[in-house]
């Protein structure tokens, strides 16, 4: 038997749960379909960091009020409840194979006024997802966990979604099913997008360790792989991971060597206990210029290159559900009715960032350990503090652009490699795409 709703939401992450909460608050008959049986359980790689704090990304900023147990989004005008541990995040460190580093942000200055100077807040993701789910249910949303969506089609003025042999119809559908969106594949949305790479990650949760110099994120360029160390909201617990654009790479083995054998960094993890291991595989496509087709919205990660981050996903869910509410009120159950969302998406997401080229390259293919040590060691002072990925990339680019004369003078052979990399960029990108396995 077909169940009929105003709105059907596929995906119970931050974007989907926020959309469900808002749709329920607004009185829409709503169904939420989620593949996991325990919707708020975080089973894949996620650092749990909320940012931007004290800066703007995608036109938004985050305010965390520990005393009120609220995470607020003052630009959009909503908040969510959070009653759990937290830790201030002060920035980003970049390390070379032999221990050179530079930082984004000055920790000494930042710590003088943490609330004003932090760039993010580490939280327990499950503990802010849980209230969203509970509020959605209280607001009358029908929730169907353990539902694997296998089909979607337009039927007249409605959209039918099939999962586990059952059909759910809505005037609108929100696809909030993540960066590897099945709905996007079923509806042919990826055909017009550029496939960039398949990105793999493997992470361990390590308890019982202290790394005082990392109060946020650390990226470590070792001789063979790039590793990351993320400070979590829990004391003496870090998330340590490795990534690659080569699906054939043995990432667990590489991570094991880094944690237990690396001559420079393994001391960070001495005595640590591995309590959890997670992985993720992301097929990276260029962002959607228009994330809407046949009354289906694609929001959050489903419409972006990689993860749009938790705050971005929450804002997408909030905006989409409100746009659909107005469309139904105005009797415009079509693209015109939700035009406010598409304008917002283009203004804050696709317009500023959608055409930016992200180069999916393995730096170690072009530079050896000594080269990377030299380049990292050139940066003597803290750089502009931020957790905005695009600002990080721009800052690195402008910093080394100014250092090119020094590199040419001191290490002309490294400069030649850098120029060679620029000339080989297209070929390198083709190799990365060839190694991947794009979603259909």
Feature-to-residue mapping (PLM):
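N-terminal Rossmann-like FAD-binding beta1-loop-alpha1 element of flavoenzymes
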Residues: 3-32
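N-terminal FAD cofactor-binding segment of flavoenzymes
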Residues: 22, 35-98
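Predominantly flavin-linked oxidoreductase catalytic cores and closely associated redox partners
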Residues: 36-38, 131-266, 304
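Helix-loop-beta segment of a Rossmann-like dinucleotide-binding subdomain
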Residues: 101-127, 158-160, 233-245
């Amino acid at each position: 038997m077909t169940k009929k709703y105003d709105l059907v939401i596929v995906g119970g992450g931050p974007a989907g749960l926020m959309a469900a909460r808002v749709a329920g608050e607004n009185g829409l008959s709503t169904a939420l379909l989620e593949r996991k049986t325990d919707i708020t359980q975080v089973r894949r790689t996620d650092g749990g960091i909320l940012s931007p704090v004290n800066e703007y990304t995608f036109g938004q900023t985050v305010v965390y009020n520990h005393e009120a147990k609220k995470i607020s989004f003052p630009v959009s005008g909503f908040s969510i409840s959070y009653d759990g541990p937290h830790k201030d995040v002060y920035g980003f460190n970049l390390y070379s194979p032999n221990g050179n580093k530079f930082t984004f942000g000055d920790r000494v200055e930042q710590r003088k006024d943490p609330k004003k100077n932090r760039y993010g807040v580490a939280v327990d993701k499950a503990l802010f997802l849980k209230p969203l789910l509970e509020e959605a249910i209280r607001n009358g949303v029908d929730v169907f966990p353990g539902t694997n969506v296998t089909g979607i089609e337009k039927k007249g003025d409605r959209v039918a979604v099939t999962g586990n042999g059952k059909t759910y119809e809505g005037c609108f559908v929100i696809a909030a099913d993540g960066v590897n969106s099945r709905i996007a594949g079923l509806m042919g949305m990826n055909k017009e997008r550029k496939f960039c790479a398949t990105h793999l990650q493997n992470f361990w949760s390590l308890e019982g360790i202290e790394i005082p110099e990392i109060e946020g994120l650390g990226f470590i360029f070792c001789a063979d792989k790039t590793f990351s160390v993320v400070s979590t909201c829990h004391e003496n617990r870090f998330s340590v991971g490795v990534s690659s654009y080569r699906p054939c790479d043995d990432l667990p083995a590489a991570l094991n060597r880094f944690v237990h054998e690396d001559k420079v960094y393994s001391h960070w993890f001495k005595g640590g206990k591995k309590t959890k291991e997670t992985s993720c595989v992301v097929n990276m496509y260029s962002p959607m210029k228009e994330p809407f087709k046949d009354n289906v919205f694609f929001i959050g990660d489903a419409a972006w290159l990689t993860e749009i981050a938790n705050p971005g996903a929450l804002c997408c869910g909030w905006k989409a559900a409100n746009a659909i509410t107005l469309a139904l009120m105005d009797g415009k159950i079509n693209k015109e009715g939700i035009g406010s969302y598409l304008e917002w998406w283009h203004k804050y997401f696709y317009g500023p960032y959608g055409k930016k080229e992200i180069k999916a390259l393995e730096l170690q293919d072009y530079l050896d350990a000594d080269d990377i040590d030299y380049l990292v060691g050139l940066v003597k002072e803290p750089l502009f503090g931020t957790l905005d990925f695009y600002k990080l990339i721009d800052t690195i680019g402008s910093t080394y652009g100014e250092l090119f004369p020094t590199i040419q003078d001191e290490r002309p052979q490294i400069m030649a490699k850098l120029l060679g990399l620029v000339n080989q960029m297209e070929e390198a990108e083709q190799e990365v795409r060839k190694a991947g396995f794009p979603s259909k």
